[in-house]
Amino acid sequence: AHSYGGVVLHDVINNTHAHKAIEKGADGLIAVAAGAGGHAGAKSPFALIAEIRQWFDGPVALSGAIATGQGVLAALAMGADFAYIGSAFIATDEARATPEYKDAIVAGNSDDIVLSNLFTGVHGNYLAPSIKAAGLDPANLPVSDPSAMNFGGDAKKAWKDIWGCGQGIGSVSKVQTTGEFVAQLKSQFEQAKAALV
């Protein structure tokens, strides 16, 4: 990315990884905190941002259960330069997710999110309905041995229909266009900011 003038932001789940990412040449960081969809961190967003900001003043995004304008404002208040929203955008018309995936997000809440390392060998957050649809019990998933995982990319991904998702989905009430969702975020952000002053 640097060769064409691009900016590199590196996902990190803790302060150690943040240091390594900057040492290796990343321009900024995406602090992936607890509650994020897919491969999530376990750190509180408060702790993660505070630790990073003690030594790094470059661009930092915060990710993890952010699905509202209020969440964006909170991320900025904690010291992030911007918020990174993922799961809520899956439930937009433009997303290439299946209708079932989008509907599960709209119908779900944080209780429907399961943390497991079974599917990739790395802990991540997934939607319980997709785990059930695969014939597994979300409450009794075995622990994976990361050393036995095939990361070569040759085999078909058996977990392709296991849907990564963050804990912020309880704030997603409908499938809408990206433009409508962004307008909603802006309105919520402005209302939340005005309420603080």
Predicted regions, residues:
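Short beta-strand/loop segments at the ligand-binding rim of alpha/beta enzyme cores
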Residues: 1-13, 55-63, 67
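Short, structured coil segments at secondary-structure junctions
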Residues: 4-5, 24-25, 56, 78-79
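Conserved short-loop catalytic and cofactor-binding motifs
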Residues: 9, 36-40, 63, 89, ...
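General beta-strand structural signal in soluble alpha/beta enzymes
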Residues: 10-12, 30-31, 62, 83-85
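Glycine/Thr-rich beta-alpha phosphate-binding loop at enzyme active sites
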Residues: 11-50, 92, 96-98
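Conserved active-site-proximal phosphate/metal-binding subdomains
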Residues: 45-61, 67-197
